[in-house]
Amino acid sequence: MRFATRVGAYEIDSVHSQPQVAHCHAFFVPNDLRGQGLAHILKSHQKATLASLGYDFATCTVCGSNAAQQRVLTRAGWVRIASFTSSKTGEEVEIWGCEVAGACSTAYITMGIQHENLLDRRRKEALL
């Protein structure tokens, strides 16, 4: 299922044989909004959504050269589980995971709220 916000979008699907495991994909922030910390807000939104949907664990994949996404995942409490070379692209692909009810949810949601407050202040200042 696709979830869209003001700062980007992502998708969450249940793993077929393990319905308590979510696979997260298609996470993106539009190019014109990048570099403002909004991926952290979007990741926080994703965490809250995963928790509200009752998942126990989440996985995602990221290109091994995508340092920005790796930083977002690390800061959110995700851990790199494995990597492999894609037979389609020849690039390294990393598999990341996180316990939804564990460290990657509560602390990160709090951080996301702080980022949202900062974003709201910036928007108000821009309107003045």
Question: Which sequence ranges carry the predicted segments?
Answer:
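A short, internal acetyl-CoA/4′-phosphopantetheine-binding micro-motif in the GNAT/acyltransferase core
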Residues: 26-34, 62-63
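Polar/charged side chains located within well-ordered beta-strands of beta-rich proteins
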Residues: 10-13, 23-24, 43-46, 73, ...
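C-terminal "cap" of GNAT-fold acetyltransferases
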Residues: 86-128
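Acetyl-CoA-dependent GNAT
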Residues: 1-25, 30, 122-127
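Conserved active-site alpha-helix within GNAT-family acetyltransferase domains
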Residues: 40, 64-82
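Conserved acetyl-CoA-binding loop-helix of GNAT-fold acetyltransferases
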Residues: 29, 35-48, 75
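Conserved GNAT acetyl-CoA-binding A-motif
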Residues: 50-62
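Short acidic/glycine-enriched loop/turn segments that link adjacent beta-strands
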Residues: 18-20, 66, 87-92
